[in-house]
From Swiss-Prot:
Cellular component GO terms held in the UniProt record: cytoplasm
Organism the protein comes from: Mycoplasmoides gallisepticum (strain R(low / passage 15 / clone 2)) (Mycoplasma gallisepticum)
Function: Catalyzes the formation of acetyl phosphate from acetate and ATP. Can also catalyze the reverse reaction.
InterPro entries given in the database record: Ac/propionate_kinase, Aliphatic_acid_kin_short-chain, Aliphatic_acid_kinase_CS, ATPase_NBD
Subcellular location, principal: cytoplasm
Official protein name in the record: Acetate kinase
Pathway listed: Metabolic intermediate biosynthesis; acetyl-CoA biosynthesis; acetyl-CoA from acetate: step 1/2
Gene of this entry: ackA
Organismal lineage: Bacteria, Bacillati, Mycoplasmatota, Mycoplasmoidales, Mycoplasmoidaceae
Catalytic activity: acetate + ATP = acetyl phosphate + ADP
């Protein structure tokens, strides 16, 4: 049976899922610490696992290792069974949809690495390796930014010198688009509507919010890079740009080093010394300020986007790692959203759920939901759609 491989490559890691034609997950896992000492962890449909350490000098060795493991565990007999490979690509600039990868497309992904150096280059490197290891498979690029190309100019323009945009492509792009696309499609099904209006909070280690009107993105909190917007695990979110120059002068750090600090040493970590929301919530009350700063930022964006939708809102939706699991965070956020008169049902949080659940009560003027996102299945479906 034909199989589809979904790959999410980072600067030093590769996450993957392997699907059959019926959207069943046959295997999943990751290779990490590429370029360092190498580690892998794989899970298979039959419940077996394979994990340990292995030298991964580059992404090529990591990919070769995971493909050999699929054969060793009889998930596939030959690489030719993998007929399509979907690649998550963070920066797609003006691509409005996922696309089959041609030499010209791959060249453009490399070129766009100047906008997303931490992401696009390793993603393009992995695409290049996959094309050589599985030459007959069709490769599809699925861009984080594509879903947000529907944003109007008023949402994506920065008030900056025109030359910055025209020559250097500086504008707001938005990210987590594949997750927002999945949640939007899911709500069209759940509510039996052709188009929906939603405020979606994608709260994970990376976090953002999107305003969805008529099933299209009209605004989102991440901007030119994923650094803008909400407080995140290690990212600062919104900050006065002058801070970068000031800290560089005060500490003799380069601009790159200061930006690196805003990406890797800020957010929850900077406020509390904990990058994981589970650690923040388990160390209350000493981390209360961190919780308040985080949830206030989320609440402020919810109100901002509800205003921009300017129509009946079908739901306020929480998704991703924190949004799907941290009930306290949802309660704290809703407590700070005063103007919308949202009311939660305490008993709803006690119910287990597989895919989604409604959290608001009958008195609430806005329905609140938790939904488990599934970016991988969207990538898999794009591969099937574009490979026909």
């Amino acid at each position: 049976m034909n199989k589809i491989l979904v790959i999410n490559a980072g600067s030093s890691s590769i996450k993957f899922q392997l699907y059959d034609a019926n959207e069943k997950v046959l295997a999943k896992g990751l290779c990490e610490r590429i370029f360092i000492d190498g580690a892998f962890k794989y899970e298979f449909e039959d419940g077996s696992k394979d994990e340990g350490n292995s030298a991964f000098p580059t992404h090529k060795e990591a990919l070769t290792h995971l493909l050999e493991s699929l054969k060793k565990h009889k998930v596939i007999n030959d690489l030719s069974e993998i007929v399509g490979v979907g690649h998550r690509v963070v920066q797609g600039a003006y691509w409005t949809d996922s696309t089959l990868i041609t030499p010209q497309v791959l060249e453009k992904i490399y070129e766009l690495a100047k906008l997303a150096p931490l992401h696009n280059k390793p993603e393009a490197d992995v695409i290049d390796v996959v094309q050589k290891l599985i030459p007959k498979a069709k490769n599809v690029a699925v861009f984080d930014t594509s879903f947000h190309t529907s944003m109007p100019e008023v949402a994506y323009e920065y008030a900056i010198p025109r030359e910055w945009k025209e020559k250097h492509l500086v504008r707001r792009y938005g990210y987590h688009g594949t997750s927002y696309r999945y949640v939007t499609k899911r709500f069209e099904q759940l509510l039996n509507k052709k188009a929906v209006n939603l405020v979606i909070c994608h709260l994970g280690n990376g976090a953002s919010i999107a305003a969805i009107k008529d099933s299209k993105s009209i605004n989102t909190s991440m901007g030119f890079t994923p650094l803008e917007g909400l407080v995140m695990g290690t990212r600062s979110g919104d900050i006065d740009p002058s801070v970068v120059q000031y800290i560089a002068k005060q500490t003799n750090k380069t601009l790159d080093q200061v930006i690196d600090d805003l990406n890797k040493k800020s957010g929850l970590l900077g406020l509390s010394s904990y990058a994981d929301m589970r650690d923040v919530t388990s160390n209350l009350p000493k981390t209360q300020l961190t919780l308040d700063v985080y949830t206030q930022r989320v609440a402020d964006y919810i109100l901002k986007y509800a205003n921009q939708i300017n129509a009946s809102i079908d739901g306020l939706v929480f998704t991703a790692g924190v949004g799907e699991n941290a009930s306290l965070i949802i309660q704290e956020v809703v407590n700070k959203v005063h103007l919308l008169k949202v009311s939660l049902d305490p008993k709803a949080f006690e119910q287990k759920y597989s895919d989604y659940r409604k959290l608001s009560d009958d008195k609430s003027q806005l329905n609140v939901y938790q939904v488990r996102t599934n970016e991988e299945i969207m990538i898999m479906r794009d591969v099937v759609r574009l490979s026909k």
